[in-house]
Amino acid sequence: MSYQRNSARASLDLRSQYQQLEGRMRSEHFNPAYQQQQQKGQNIPLSLPSSLAQRNPIPYPIDAVTSDPTIPAQLNVYDHDRQNSIVDAAAGTNTTHSLNSNNIPSSQNNNINNNNINNVGSFTDPSMLTLPKMSLHSHQKQYDSNQNDPRSPLAILIPTSAQPTDVLSARFSAWRNVIRAILVYLSETASIQDEIVRQQLRLSHAVQFPFFSIENQYQPVSNEDKSMQKFFLPLGSGSVQDLPTMLTKYHDNLASLASKSSKELTSEIIPRLEDLRRDLLVKIKEIKALQSDFKNSCNKELQQTKHLMKLFNESLKECKLGTPKSDPFLIKLQLEKQIKRQLVEENYLHEAFDNLQNSGAQLESVIVMEIQNGLTSYARILGKEAQVVFDSVISKLDSTILNKNTNLEWDSFILRNISNFVPPNLPMRRFKEISYSNQNDPFTFEVKSGFLEKRSKFLKSYSRGFYVLTPSFLHEFKTPDKHKFSTPLMSIPLVECTVTEHSKKTKSNSEQGKNKFILRTNSNGLIHRGHNWVFKVDSYDDMIEWFGNIKALSSLPNYDDKCKYVSKVAKLSKEKAKSNENTTESVTPQVTNEQHTRYDDVSSSNFPLNSIPKLDNLTITNTTSSIPETNDSQIQNRVPEFYIENVDSPRKSNQL
């Protein structure tokens, strides 16, 4: 019998015990005092036969299958997220390949391919071979702690290759054997009405728990019985495995005192347990149908995250050395997108574990409750006998399995099988809780972004594009929507650029929108000639800000100076954003005198322009990847694109 994923998962969810018991409890012979004690989590005392006579079993044929309308909706959302993550994974793989092929030399690519990512940080890492013994021990200890850190993107805290449905099916199959053993025992009890002595011997042999230990009498022999025994608490813990020992002792002590009434056994207790056992077989099939929910690609996503993390750290190292081949800003976008994709897959698997474990816990609670009800009814029958009956078995049942929480076995089972199940109180991880080294490095900041117009090389017309200025590059993107495009159409390394001049502030220029500046890329030989990039900005103040930032970043000599400058710009941006939030009236954005002075000082600084290293690193790529979302509500009216003008163009000075 086949099941769909969502329907199978939803069908396993059980109604609460109180909903299932509603309308099924008998009104006759129901003791209010016993109900009050049950609400307090206590069992009725078994010291008097009269109290047992008042304790009526609850007729409870299990009906564990219900449809919770909220569960399929949640599962559909997770299935949709998972499908999107798979599509994004394919797109992310292509984007990463494009980025690596353009920004990393072939020799470096070969080195990356030859290095095993899983080998990093382990004792087989060549960099670890020369460390002292204590350093190796400390490194391994730190590596193990990172694998269990819920904030680390390189840690997966839930099992990814487990088979929980097989384990749980085997567990409930063992429960069916427990119920079968109880049924055999109770059936034999109902047949000893006239032959007390002979029937007591029969009942002694009817205690058939092949995988449970019986004190001083029996121990499981076969491997199958021993494996089933591990599903339950050990002998002496007061749980279900103590039951066969107590029953055997009881029949040895009551060979001549048994006087039974089989009517209640054959009409109520046995049929209910038989219904429970039949329904449990259906539940086992439903559990096995959930096996496909635990097929996942978490390990594949983790390897991709490790790969991008390595590229991210290498790019930052290159930027700090002053010879960047790829921008950490772009790789960080790819890394964060991959982490989100990994968390979607991981949380889908986590949700599957939660659904299976919660449903299994509820199902086992019903099973244990049914066994408790059956044994309670049986104890009431035994209470009609002499005090020896009470001393031999009833008091022991009441102090052990009848008084245990229904989740006692389940909680112990989960804790003993932590490699196959998720701990009950383990929360799901969120992206905002993820942290990694160099996450807020200044070289990953966005110095400035917005729309610019760039003059075409041949048509002399201007096209519009969205630009992002980072400490190392000037990138052109197709749109400001960073969720759709994470790889730029074009990237210009600032180490190969200088800004030469900009237009003057005049009334006519402001009216006609002719606020321009020229960005020159240096020549790298015969193949890559220098170019003059002519950009046009809507306002003069905005042009000065672009000009000043590019001039400063392309002229700063080392990593520390760039970090100080970027931190200063970021601080000013935060102060400006805070002041805009406190303003209640809408005003035209203006650049303050302090900003004019700052950028004018930058534009007039004496940084050596000829000391810029020459790198053949101009990147022009097309992509469909996404970059983080950018609010473009304040730049809606500025929509330019980029073009290149040859350095030999004679019209450069005439058109400014």
From Swiss-Prot:
Any single biological process term in GO: establishment or maintenance of actin cytoskeleton polarity
Keyword Cell division listed? The answer is: no
PROSITE patterns cross-referenced by the UniProt entry: PH_DOMAIN (PS50003)
A GO term, aspect molecular function: phosphatidylinositol binding
Localization annotation: Cell membrane
Q: What does the record's miscellaneous section state?
A: Present with 2610 molecules/cell in log phase SD medium.
Describe its assembly: Heterodimer of SLM1-SLM2. Binds phosphatidylinositol 4,5-bisphosphate, which is required for function. Interacts with the TORC2 subunits AVO2, BIT61 and TOR2. Interacts with the calcineurin catalytic subunits CNA1 and CNA2.
Function (record text): Together with SLM1, effector of the TORC2- and calcineurin-signaling pathways. Phosphorylated and activated by TORC2 under favorable growth conditions. Mediates actin polarization via inhibition of calcineurin-dependent transcription. Upon nutrient limitation or environmental stress, gets dephosphorylated by calcineurin, inhibiting interaction with TORC2, thereby antagonizing TORC2 signaling and mediating calcineurin-dependent actin depolarization. Also functions in heat-induced, calcineurin-mediated uracil permease (FUR4) endocytosis.
Query: Would you tell me the protein name for this molecule?
Result: Phosphatidylinositol 4,5-bisphosphate-binding protein SLM2
What is the species listed in this Swiss-Prot or TrEMBL entry?
Saccharomyces cerevisiae (strain ATCC 204508 / S288c)
Q: What's the source species' lineage?
A: Eukaryota, Fungi, Dikarya, Ascomycota, Saccharomycotina
The coding gene here is: SLM2
